[in-house]
């Protein structure tokens, strides 16, 4: 009996004192392994998207990291206001934020963001993204302030059923717009649809300037003037609807889906909307080559991007995440899980990437010049002022020469 008690006491002592490394491990709390993981908080436009949640889950495993995702406001104005407040106030709770072109064009001037050219967007990585776009949107004074992760290309979309009704296989030039319009049977149908609401019209105006080979920053250029003249003529000749002055992309897409428009210019992000509405297909709504309006073939692109909050206390973790997201492997995983076009051109060109409409995307990348939109530090002011001038012009409320002069003054003021 005494021998048993001695053995029991000895065993208890061994458990308490431990031996070697066993003692040090026994003193750690059960959650210690999780506490050793790097932590990261991302405010993201796709926080509620199940596919993005899957991407984050896979990334956590890959990087052995604990990532919290917070939602952005869905309204564009509210979103920009909230993110601006977070950055300006030095809020340390958000490390990475997803921003669009309008936001980065403002924030990169403010000192809110961590430069990324030394440890993330190195020269080798940078070469895999559209170069002119990076220079125009992501860079300032020799620094790169963002990592693009999703590409949006301004595509030409057609309703093939309405084209067939007009006896057209495709729209090749301005004459085909007229043919299409004459074939439409209802007074509320138009050959061309657009979104000319005050925060959207600059997309279209700069796009048409691209088609004519003009320069959005030079309103003395005859080609720039011709682009604006043609947009006015489309309204005058009723090839497009006056109702679109109050339409944003959501309303334009809805009308396009309902067969009100024969064709539109819209970003690739609309693909999901058309798929969900079951109207996407080669004999329905689909992406098409650009009409030939000028020998220079160009279109606008935009991206969603990550920026690193300068006030972040988790910069090491943030940089690791950005290195993965900017790299070939991370960008490929993003494309496959999200079913979305990544910002890296080499990943889009990878034949292993099988996304809806990818062949047309590759055609645009190979055959057309990709232009960044005309944005500046005060993009909202520039966009709003140009919209007012353009609306007055196309509605006949100001003379042509006056519009061109005021448009140039607007450019000189903001850019």
Where are these regions (language model features)?
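Glycine-centered hinge/linker elements that transmit conformational signals in sensory
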Residues: 181-185, 217-248, 290
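Conserved N-terminal structural module of periplasmic/extracytoplasmic solute-binding proteins
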Residues: 4-6, 13, 19-105, 122-124, ...
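Hinge/lid segment of periplasmic solute-binding proteins
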Residues: 28, 101-154, 178, 186, ...
């Amino acid at each position: 009996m005494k021998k048993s008690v001695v053995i029991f006491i000895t065993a208890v002592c061994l458990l308490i004192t431990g031996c070697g490394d066993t003692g040090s491990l026994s003193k750690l709390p059960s959650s210690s392994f999780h506490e050793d993981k790097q932590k990261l908080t991302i405010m993201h436009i796709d926080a509620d998207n199940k596919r993005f949640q899957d991407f984050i889950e896979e990334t956590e495993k890959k990087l052995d990291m604990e990532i919290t995702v917070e939602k952005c406001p869905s309204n564009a104005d509210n979103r920009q206001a909230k993110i601006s407040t977070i950055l300006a106030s030095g809020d340390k709770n958000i490390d990475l934020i997803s921003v669009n072109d309008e936001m980065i064009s403002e924030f990169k001037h403010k000192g809110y963001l961590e430069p990324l050219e030394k440890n993330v967007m190195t020269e080798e990585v940078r070469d895999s993204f559209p170069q002119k776009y990076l220079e125009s949107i992501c860079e300032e004074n020799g620094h790169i302030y963002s990592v693009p992760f999703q590409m949006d290309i301004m595509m030409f979309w057609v309703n093939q059923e309405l084209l067939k009704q007009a006896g057209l296989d495709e729209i090749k030039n301005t004459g085909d717009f007229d043919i299409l319009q004459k074939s439409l049977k209802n007074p509320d149908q138009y050959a061309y649809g657009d979104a000319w609401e005050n925060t959207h019209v600059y997309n279209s105006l700069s796009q048409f300037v691209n088609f004519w080979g003009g320069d959005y920053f030079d309103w003395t250029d005859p080609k720039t003037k011709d682009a604006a003249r043609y947009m006015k003529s489309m309204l005058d000749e009723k090839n497009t609807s006056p109702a679109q002055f109050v339409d944003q992309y959501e309303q334009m897409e809805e009308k396009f889906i309902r067969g009100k428009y024969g064709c539109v210019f819209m970003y690739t992000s609309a693909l999901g909307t058309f798929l969900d509405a079951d109207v996407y297909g080669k004999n329905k709504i689909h992406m098409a080559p650009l009409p030939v309006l000028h020998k220079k073939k160009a279109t606008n692109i935009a991206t969603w991007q990550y920026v690193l909050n300068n006030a972040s206390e988790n910069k090491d973790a943030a940089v690791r995440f950005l290195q993965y997201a900017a790299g070939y492997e991370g960008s490929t995983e993003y494309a496959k899980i999200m079913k979305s076009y990544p910002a890296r051109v080499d990943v889009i060109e990878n034949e292993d990437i099988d996304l809806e409409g990818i062949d047309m995307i590759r055609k645009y990348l190979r055959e057309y010049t990709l232009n960044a939109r005309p944005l500046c530090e005060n993009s909202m002011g520039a966009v709003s002022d140009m919209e007012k001038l353009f609306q007055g012009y196309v509605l006949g409320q100001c003379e042509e020469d006056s519009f061109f002069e005021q448009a140039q003054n607007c450019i000189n003021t903001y850019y």
